[in-house]
Amino acid sequence: MRSIYKIVVCSLLTLSITSCEKDLLEKEQYQKEIYLIGAYNRVWTTEVSYSNEEVKTYFTVSSSGTLALDRDVNVKMKINEELVDIYNKKYWTVLNEDKYYKSLDTDLYSIPSLENTVIKHAEGISAEVPVLIKTASLKIDQSYVIPVEIESTTGYPISESGYKMLILLKLKNDYSGSYQMSGHTTLEGETPKTIQKPKTIKPTGVNTVRLFYAMNNESDEKADIQTGTIELTITDQIVEGTNDVKKVLIKNESSTVTRKKDCYRI
């Protein structure tokens, strides 16, 4: 009899717990708010390519909570230039002014749906916002940002901690990236010495890159960049007798660069 009683009690407890879990799953567990993905970190980074044409990237507006949206949400956003100054003064010092973020000129980008982005509840809890950018004239040593802020929404409140952010542009091209340098140096009257060193090749344009040559260490300081780097311009001319060797201009001198499995040999 006791065993039967225990089984009945356990069964009732199981049913009660299952019922509670079901009720919890059917109710919103958090405050449902509209926010920008990346805003909690203040800065959201997106990669964009150097191009002579307009390039497209995206950022995302989304909703928090455990349940799906029950209606469409219209989100109105704006560009807030003050965010850039606020960030620079808070996170950089006067000594780092050359590293300050710079607001991208408005004539170099457009956000067609900035003032009317719709999160369609039938399609999910977020919506991508396209950004069209002209990158050809941008400088690799300048940190460009687009300061965006949610101004108003319909149906749900705006997240107080996730409604504004800086979109930081990370520039790239077909040749930029990390490489392993292999080479040798020869001083007059001495035996050649082999040198190997990992290198980061930075883009400076559509077909141009910059690197610290020889054993020079990489640096973000202007003086080091001026004295320790070379700039390569990769042309469309193929070296005679080869299939994949392109001619490269190095400070008004000509050289060649061989591409093989994403590795360049100078």
Which role does the model predict for each range below?
Residues E21-V118, S126-I266:
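Intrinsically disordered, low-complexity regulatory regions in eukaryotic proteins
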Residues S3-C10:
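Sec-dependent signal peptide recognition
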Residues C10-T14, K251:
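Generic signature of intrinsically disordered, low-complexity, basic-rich segments
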Residues L15-S19:
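C-terminal motif of bacterial Sec signal peptides marking the signal peptidase cleavage site
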